[in-house]
Amino acid sequence: VLDENDWEGYQIATKELTRTLLIGDDLTVTNPALLKRAHEESAVQGFIFKPNQIGTITEAVEAHRYAKEHNMLTIPSQRGGGTIWDVVIDLGVGLETEACKSCAPRGGESVYAMNCLYRAAQENPDAALFDFSPLVKF
């Protein structure tokens, strides 16, 4: 298990775990400066998008833009046990992120997230699913 400040460990893991995508969460905390460092040091291939970690939606979107410009994944994270009206999944749809992280649809917040994705698919029937095949390392 890597510590949230173990930059060298993440670099080694990214290099050695060739069949695994390493995604920053506590390492990058949706912080554009930390995401840039993680990219420059080849520490992760993407990040968990949580605007509450960095503090503003503006900074979170800036991190997403940096990731997109550098072919990194942005993965919005809907909080299990969080509020029903959490906008993180909505932001992910609006930003056209590659994936989202959610728990099983057992509580109101996860059902809300699934419904958000369902509505987006209904409103955009021509939208293509993200092709993960170039990222599969098997």
Residue ranges and their predicted role:
Residues 1-138:
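Catalytic core of soluble alpha/beta enzymes
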